[in-house]
Amino acid sequence: MADDSNDTATDVEPDYRFTLANERTFLAWQRTALGLLAAAVALVQLVPELTIPGARQVLGVVLAILAILTSGMGLLRWQQADRAMRRHLPLPRHPTPGYLAVGLCVVGVVALALVVAKAITG
């Protein structure tokens, strides 16, 4: 493991407004993760069975996994941005919004297909 003792000597306290903005962004990621987790629980517990048995559970698990990844990646993003601000480095780009968007689109398309199939078959 690398020794971080020399890295901390170059850290500078950033403007508090940037620190608070970074924290607000982190909290927004956590709210998104909580919303995904609530959607997963609601899907599994409240939605009637769809055309394919077990489809609710699979979609619920996918949403729960997205929630866990969103929460973890939000924390990672917060740490990376904080470190960059303290060292006067450019803010790192992060692929998390793209992953989240693709995951939600896949869940949405599958859910739509299942609902349409249920409506057609009765």
Swiss-Prot record:
<feature type="transmembrane region" description="Helical">
    <location>
        <begin position="33"/>
        <end position="53"/>
    </location>
</feature>
<comment type="similarity">
    <text>To E.coli YidH.</text>
</comment>
<keyword id="KW-1133">Transmembrane helix</keyword>
<dbReference type="GO" id="GO:0005886">
    <property type="term" value="C:plasma membrane"/>
</dbReference>
<keyword id="KW-0812">Transmembrane</keyword>
<dbReference type="InterPro" id="IPR052053">
    <property type="entry name" value="IM_YidH-like"/>
</dbReference>
<protein>
    <recommendedName>
        <fullName>Uncharacterized protein Mb2295</fullName>
    </recommendedName>
</protein>
<keyword id="KW-0472">Membrane</keyword>
<dbReference type="Pfam" id="PF02656">
    <property type="entry name" value="DUF202"/>
</dbReference>
<keyword id="KW-1003">Cell membrane</keyword>
<dbReference type="InterPro" id="IPR003807">
    <property type="entry name" value="DUF202"/>
</dbReference>
<feature type="transmembrane region" description="Helical">
    <location>
        <begin position="58"/>
        <end position="78"/>
    </location>
</feature>
<feature type="transmembrane region" description="Helical">
    <location>
        <begin position="97"/>
        <end position="117"/>
    </location>
</feature>
